[in-house]
């Protein structure tokens, strides 16, 4: 019930939601991504079909299942007879490494409020690696991208509108390394709190 209350407040524009690192499987984040996937699926239909379309939702509890590399991505829509079948997002990625290798962060949208006061690029000396594809609905904006020397990359600062509210995911984290003692990473979180709080208060 508490998770659904959070989801409803975000959808109503009264609350912003920030997910950090392994919160990609936090129940509120998963539910918000499911609601965004449902909205995207409806929006992709011809307008005349949207009100009468029949839906079946699969994969409502995606927790702790990591897909194999090359598996079909989610969310995914398929029509079976007269029913639209939506496989909800897994909210995870097929590859990760906890070896503490450094990452290189690039600010892709320097004029966005989430990037205020941040450099064009910065390095995180030690971090866990998450590698694309990240199985979530396509973000409205990708503010930051992260890369590793072995070739992996990740949309490490992604922003979605869910209903009237904002959802922001910031990938860097892991309790083994001092990620949240680094000034740039803390500035991202500060910017997100200030901007999303102001947006919610304005509505």
Listing of model-derived features with the role each one plays in the protein:
Residues 1-30, 164:
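Short alpha-beta junction capping motif
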Residues 2, 6, 29, 110, ...:
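Stable alpha-helical elements in mature extracytoplasmic
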Residues 3-5, 128-131, 154-156:
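A generic local structural motif
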Residues 9, 132-135, 159-161:
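A general structural signal for short secondary-structure junctions and capping/turn motifs
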Residues 11-12, 22, 34, 194-198:
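Sec-exported extracytoplasmic/periplasmic mature domains
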Residues 20-145, 149, 203:
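An acidic, glycine-rich "communication" segment
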Residues 140-141, 147-156, 161-203:
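Extracellular ligand-binding/catalytic regions of CAZymes and related secreted enzymes
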